[in-house]
Amino acid sequence: MTNDQVTALIDRHIDGWNRRDPTLLASNHAEDGVVLSPMFARVRGRAQIRDSYAALFAAFPDWQMQFGAPIVDGNRVAIAFSVTATHQGDFMGLAGSGRRCAFEGVSLYQLDADLLIKEERRVYDFTGLLAQVGVVRIRPAS
C-alpha cells in the first residue's frame, strides 16, 4: 500500500462527500467496515454505513465539507474537516428547523489490505451541533 494509493482512496471519499453520494461514500468502506461517530454511534457494515450517509444528507441536504491535507502513516489516515449545513429534514427526532450549523472535526481512518476503510472514527463537537439546530440548549457559563 503506497501513499499514492491511500491518497487516491481519500480523494474518492472526499469526492463522495462533495457529491453527497451515500453509495459512492459507502463503496470506500470495507463490507464489514465500522464507522464510529457522535451522530450515529457505531455503524457496522457497508449497507448500514450507506444508510447513515443517506440519513445525514436527508437532514442536511446542503451539507458542505472542506478538508485539510490528509496525514498518511501506512494504513492509517487523519484528516481535518469543517462543515456547514442547514438543518432541513428530520434529525434526532427534530423536524427541519432551517437553522444553519457549522463545526470542525477530524476523521481517523484505518484501511484494510484491499485499500478500503475498515474503521472510520469521527471526532467533533456534537453537543455544539445539537445546540445549533435546537435539539439541546446550552447555558452560558457564569
Question: Where are these predicted regions, by residue range?
Answer:
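C-terminal and inter-domain tail/linker signature
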Residues: 1-142
